[in-house]
Amino acid sequence: MTIDRNQGNFEAEEPPPTIKEVEQAVKKLKNNKAPGLDLSTAELVKFGGPEYARHLHQLIVKIWITEIITEEWNQSIVCPIHKRGNVMICSNYRGISLLCIAYKIFSNILFNRLSPFVEGIIGDYQCEFRQGRSTNDQIFAIRQVLEKCNEFQIETHHLFIDFRSAYDSIDRDNLFLAMEKMHIPRKLMALARAAKRKTQCQIKIKDMLSSPIITRNGVRQGDSLACLLFNLALEKVIRDAGINTRGTIFYTSQFKFWHLQMILI
C-alpha cells in the first residue's frame, strides 16, 4: 500500500504500535546473526514468547509517546568487512553495524509505518529497496531502451555512478528537513530523528572494542530504516537538481541511467 502525499491529513498523530505489530517484528528477525552491545540474539527474543513481547510493547509505546529513545539503542558495534584490494587500506572495508535487538524490533515497526508514505513520495525512477522491483526488471528495461534506441538511431548515454560511502555521507539535518518538506507525518519524522540522535559506535577487531565514537552523519548499515532514509535523501538530490526524470531508470546506490539530454552532474 502507498499513501499519496497530496491526500490525507499529514498532521494527524500516528497511533502507537499494537502488540501484534511487535510480535510480527519479532517473527521477522533473522536467526544466526551476531548480537549488539546487549548480547541478545533473535533466537533468545523469540524464545521469550508473548511475555517478552508484552514488556517490549510497553517500552515501545512509551518511546512512541515521549519520542525519546533509550541511550543503549543509539549505540552499535561496527565490524569492518573486507571488500577488495589491500587489507591495510581502510577504504577497502565496509562496516556492518551490530544493533541492539530491541532497537531492531522498533526500527522494523517504524519502517513498516514509514514505507507507505515513502512509496507515495519517491518517483518511479527509483528502484532500490522497493518491493516488486527486481534487478531482472531493470536489466530488461535497459535492454529495451538500448534495442529501441539502436533501432531508431537515437543517441543514448549510460552513466554509472558508484557512491563512495553512500550511507555514511548523508547529512542528517538536511535529510530531516527534506522529510518535513515531503510531508512525512510529524510523529514518524520525530521518531526517525530520535533514532539518529547522539548515535555512537565502537569498532570491533577480533575480540577488541574501540572507545565509543560519536557519529553525526549518515545512516547505519544493518538498520531497517537506512534504506528508506537513503531513498528519501536521493529523492531530495534529484528534485534539487531539477532533473527531468522522464524515461529515466535509477537502480541501487551504484547505478543510474539517463538519456543524453537528462545527464546533469
Predicted feature residues:
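Short helix-interrupting loop/turn segments at helix-coil junctions
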Residues: 1, 32-35, 54, 66-72, ...
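Surface-exposed loop/turn segments and immediately adjacent short secondary-structure elements
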Residues: 1-91, 97, 101, 105
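Eukaryotic intrinsically disordered and solvent-exposed regulatory patches
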Residues: 64-66, 143-147, 246, 251-253
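Conserved catalytic palm subdomain of right-hand nucleotidyl-transferase polymerases, strongest
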Residues: 32-40, 78, 88-98, 137-180, ...
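Conserved polymerase palm-domain catalytic core
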Residues: 163-261
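Amphipathic alpha-helical oligomerization segments
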Residues: 133-139, 228
